[in-house]
């Protein structure tokens, strides 16, 4: 598991930590770290030789300023709250669709329609989402403008995590196929 994450996201240390914590609800398996590190490193190197070692989101070229550390602590706290919101929203929508007494063929249609409406207003919500994260990283927020909304790019960027949470919850919680891991990465990145 750690090797796959480290290869796909080109983050061997992240894959190691992911493998050590993902199987446990409130724990961290220390005995798994060394084997996961070896698997993650080997997976990363093999994938790197095939696909290249360039990071997905580029390199950070700025300077380190210790005065910014409290801002990163606040960002971590906000991301933690967003993770809780993501889980609560997803399960609330999923449970609501389970309780809904209509055909199981209708539920994904309704979820897909709701996701489509959100995507119509903000197309950046659909898909993997890494494209607009890259644009934000390189300070090119003007490059994504919704054809319908005329909101400033910064407002769109601030609302995207919430809209991504709602769209993911409707599309998968209604019975559609897909996963919650990759959207969670994008939500956390935004």
Question: Can you name each region flagged by the protein language model?
Answer:
Residues 1-190:
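Alpha-helical transmembrane segments and immediately membrane-proximal extracytoplasmic
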